[in-house]
């Protein structure tokens, strides 16, 4: 299970423990989990007419076709972290029969894993990515999932009321992996999070830190949402967050 590292040693041991020792233990924990996550990837033993990369999640072999010339059609480590988290935390974050939307779905790996875990999934991305996204989702979920996943266009901040009216947004979870980087649409991304999120919606968001711009987005995000760091992977410069709308009404 991925969880934020905590230690419950006796007080005397904790007082004797140096910061260096703590950092060494945290580095070991990070290395162990990252190795386990990356072990879920495999490549075809033989060359085929269609290039694909393989992953093992939820007891299934998932084959993903990527487009190396397109940033949004590549499986990035953040997606693997989120898939691993969903698979290993099914008791706390049960996907069965939940309404789930993934923004910036890219190749569709996270949406596929959520579908295999029993969720009603809507996978979204830019129009130019939908063909490959639909292909990957169809080939990996057909006859395998409780609910057939949907693929929809979602350009952040554009025609949200028309395509995703607030009255019909009843998402239990919003999933996002590596949607924050050096692109000019961070404000539109924040608007999209806000539009899709109800008081009871849980956002599970994995982020790779690259530039100061990402830290500024975090500050803006925290104006609207209560943000909790669940896990950190220093070797990957990745953090996993859970977020809920601020000032939400009790259910």
Name each model feature, range by range.
Residues 1-251:
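S-adenosylmethionine-dependent methyltransferases
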């Amino acid at each position: 299970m991925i969880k934020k590292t905590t230690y419950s040693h006796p007080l005397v041991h904790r007082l004797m423990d140096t910061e260096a020792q703590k950092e060494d233990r945290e580095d070991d924990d990070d290395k162990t989990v990252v190795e386990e996550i990356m072990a879920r990837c495999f490549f075809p033993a033989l060359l085929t007419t269609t290039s694909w990369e393989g992953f093992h999640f939820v007891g299934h072999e998932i084959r993903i076709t990527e487009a190396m010339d397109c940033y949004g059609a590549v499986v990035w480590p953040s997606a693997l972290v989120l898939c691993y988290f969903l698979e290993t935390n099914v008791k706390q974050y049960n996907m069965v029969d939940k309404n789930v939307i993934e923004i910036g779905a890219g190749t569709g790996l996270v949406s596929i894993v959520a579908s295999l875990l029993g969720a009603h999934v809507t996978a979204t991305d830019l129009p130019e990515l939908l063909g490959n996204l639909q292909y990957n989702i169809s080939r990996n979920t057909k006859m395998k999932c409780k609910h057939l996943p949907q693929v929809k266009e979602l350009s952040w901040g554009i025609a949200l009321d028309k395509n995703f009216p607030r009255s019909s947004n009843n998402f239990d979870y919003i999933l996002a992996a590596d949607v924050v980087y050096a692109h000019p649409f961070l404000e539109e991304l924040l608007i999209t999070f806000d539009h899709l999120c109800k008081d009871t919606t849980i956002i599970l968001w994995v982020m790779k830190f690259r530039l100061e711009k990402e830290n500024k987005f975090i500050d803006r995000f925290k104006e609207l949402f209560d943000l909790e760091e669940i896990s950190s992977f220093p070797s990957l410069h990745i953090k996993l967050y859970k977020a809920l709308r601020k000032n939400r009404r009790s259910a």
